């Protein structure tokens, strides 16, 4: 239910708020609120502020204690509350082709509610997945959002929400402004205040293992593009290799059966298709790694498929790449892959939400997305082409061959000899002491470092 004069003094922010705002942006947002008022309702459940954290900070900075609030009519899930938070901010960014209008506003001012029949617009506008996600929450929880429109009916802010209201045939909350103030409102509303930020959220890295694919089972329909396009045409049976982060290990198992000297290591190997970690298998793989390094040295090539898109922090990304560098001898080959930021842009450009799956991502300034499911945060990392190339420069990788497309990227790089012991030690401590369910850790960093020590000057 919408309340236009709700007491906000008792509201507490959700711990999972995935939005960060610095002091400069907060000051600019406060100026916007002072000049325009609060044009979009906050979203509340009980005394919990579900969405609108930064606007509430701005209101309190200005000493304002009452504001427009939409109170959710029923219990929610944390998953939905996070989606509210993301969409409450995400709807600020319209695609520009909505051509959305609302009739009957000529004598209105401030907040009003209109029927869906008064809304018109381009229902084939871009950002179809934004509308789909908004509509799902509207159907479950009622008309929680709003838009800004002129008295002549032009929607100038949050047009995607207005189109979703028309889709779902639900009432639309509109903040109506005089036509002469359109330019002023747009100058404030089109600015970005704060950024998505997921670094403070809980990390249970072993959860990422649930994304492991059975690559060569079920008819081999999930083959690895990195293996098929870059690795297999180059690696020979004689040199030694290792697949780091091998998931279920299908490719390594298949190639060993064909005579390849290819070890593999997965720190969170699952037992079959279940969700239980096979800690004994992981320890056996680490034992083999330690013995291999001690008796034969570093590897001629290293493969790391779809690991960098599953890291959950900048530190984890650095650690993975540094361990790859340590595993591969100087002059050897490293093959690795990840997901492209272009995939996000492609989704936002789509005019129809054809898939039943949620494909909408809100990316933070480090390239991470976060999805809350089953009590845990799941992360994905997306890279631009330039970011991938910069990672190679930082880690001393010379790109020999690269494949970049709108969804993924794949690299074959040549390793140099610039690795320091201090860097490798830090990375190994991170990777081989990652937490496990129940509060324990992998606990094998000392063994791995002892094997590496004679090999790194």
Regions found by a protein language model. Name each.
Residues 238, 299-300:
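Local beta-strand N-terminus motif with an aromatic residue
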Residues 30, 256, 321-325:
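A structural alpha-helix within SAM-dependent methyltransferase catalytic domains
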Residues 303-306:
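A conserved beta-strand element that flanks and buttresses the S-adenosyl-L-methionine
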Residues 1-177, 181, 186-194:
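Short, charged/polar connector segments at secondary-structure boundaries
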Residues 309-313:
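A short His-aromatic
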Residues 83, 120-127, 172-293, 333-457:
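Class I (Rossmann-like) S-adenosyl-L-methionine-dependent methyltransferase catalytic domain
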Residues 318-333:
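A short glycine-rich, Lys/Arg-flanked "PGG" loop and its adjoining helix->strand segment in the class I
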């Amino acid at each position: 239910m919408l309340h236009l004069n709700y007491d906000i003094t008792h509201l507490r922010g959700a711990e999972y708020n995935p939005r960060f705002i610095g002091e400069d942006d907060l000051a600019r947002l406060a100026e916007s609120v002072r000049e325009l008022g609060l044009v979009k309702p906050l979203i509340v459940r009980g005394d919990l502020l579900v969405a609108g954290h930064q606007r509430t900070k701005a209101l309190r900075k200005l000493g304002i204690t009452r504001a427009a609030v939409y109170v959710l009519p029923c219990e929610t899930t944390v998953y939905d509350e996070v989606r509210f938070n993301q969409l409450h901010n995400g709807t600020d960014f319209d695609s520009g082709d909505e051509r959305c209008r609302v009739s009957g506003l000529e004598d209105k001012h401030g907040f009003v509610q209109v029927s869906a029949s008064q809304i018109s617009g381009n229902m084939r506008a871009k950002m179809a997945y934004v509308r789909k996600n908004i509509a799902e929450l509207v159907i479950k929880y009622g008309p929680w959002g709003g838009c800004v429109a002129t008295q002549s009916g032009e929607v100038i802010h949050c047009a995607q929400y207005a189109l979703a209201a028309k889709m779902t045939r639900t009432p639309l909350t509109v903040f109506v402004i005089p036509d002469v103030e359109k330019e002023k409102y747009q100058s404030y509303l089109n600015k970005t205040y704060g950024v998505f930020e997921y670094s403070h959220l809980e990390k249970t890295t072993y959860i990422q293992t649930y994304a492991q694919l059975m690559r060569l089972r079920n008819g081999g329909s999930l083959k690895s593009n990195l293996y098929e396009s870059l690795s297999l045409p180059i690696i020979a049976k004689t040199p030694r290799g290792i697949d780091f982060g091998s998931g279920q290990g299908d490719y390594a198992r298949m190639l060993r059966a064909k005579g390849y000297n290819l070890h593999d290591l997965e720190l969170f190997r699952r037992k079959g298709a279940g969700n239980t970690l096979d800690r004994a298998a992981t320890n056996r793989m680490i034992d083999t790694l330690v013995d291999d390094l001690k008796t034969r040295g570093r590897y001629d090539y290293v493969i790391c498929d779809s690991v960098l898109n599953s890291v959950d922090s900048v530190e984890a990304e650095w650690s993975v790449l540094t361990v790859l560098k340590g595993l591969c001898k100087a002059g050897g080959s490293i093959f690795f892959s990840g997901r492209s930021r272009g995939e996000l842009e492609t989704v936002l450009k789509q005019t129809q939400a054809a898939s039943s799956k949620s494909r909408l991502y809100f990316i933070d300034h480090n390239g991470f997305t976060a999805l809350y499911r089953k009590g845990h945060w799941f992360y994905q990392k997306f890279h631009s082409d330039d970011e991938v190339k910069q990672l190679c420069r930082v880690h001393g990788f010379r790109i020999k061959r690269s494949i970049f497309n709108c969804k993924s990227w794949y690299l074959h790089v040549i390793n140099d000899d610039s690795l320091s012991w201090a860097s490798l030690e830090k990375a190994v401590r991170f990777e081989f002491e990652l937490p496990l369910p129940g509060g324990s850790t992998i606990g094998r960093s000392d063994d791995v470092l002892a094997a590496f020590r004679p090999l790194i000057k």
